[in-house]
């Protein structure tokens, strides 16, 4: 159940927004996660940038841990102005955010920065994505990522797609569907429960990310990392209420846009570093627990991508039926992925130039 009464909360938010407008404007930001880790650091950096770029005239006040509303309520809550800003997860708003959910399909780059920049440009230039955000009464400002999908397994090494058959794997989203189609027995529950499930033998492998394996201590109960480097979950956005955004002075709207774009690079920098550090630490050993890393062969990864085509077709059918052009979205997304991959190869990451 949502943690707010929409009309009452929207009224309170409007009063708070109006009262602050004479001196400084404070935007309430609903965030389901806690104020800890690399993504939270990027969000705090974003808020500081907004304040700096507006000389303190525009500020963001985070409400962490779902204290205003839960993750499933964020899109509607921000659209109804129960909070001025928030983070949304595309899989929780599959119907409303069909075009944006292209970022969760197993088609994009597994490079964190390339994926984030491609999604940012798509979300800020695609007429289809703009239509979806407009319908929700929100404006897109920036993007997050889970980073690339990996597996950590207990007494099991997967080296080809045939190895998925019969393996119990905790997974989610399109990636879980692909593994299921390959014969895996996919269980869907919170990643925070995976450690106990691995230890108990309820699952053999967990779909996770390198930094997540370290945080959740998967390495304590499972020793084999299958480095799939397979796509990312990129349908994860920063949004602001459209009416609130449009009423801000032009310089403040510009500051929000520019800080949102800059935050995309900051998220990439922090997440890539977190993954690198986590992998190095787990390989070296943490508290006596070491992992072995197994690179999934490129030829087999190509088969994974091929297996995902069925689910792309399903997304396309739903997206077209909802009045969008799935082919146009996919073509632009793929072109942007190629654009930023070429830039990365030519110039390296922005923070390394």
Regions found by a protein language model. Give the residues of each.
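Bacterial N-terminal signal peptides that target proteins for export
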Residues: 1-11
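N-terminal secretory/targeting leader peptides
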Residues: 11, 24-116, 124, 128-353
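N-terminal signal peptide c-region/cleavage motif recognized by signal peptidases
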Residues: 16-20
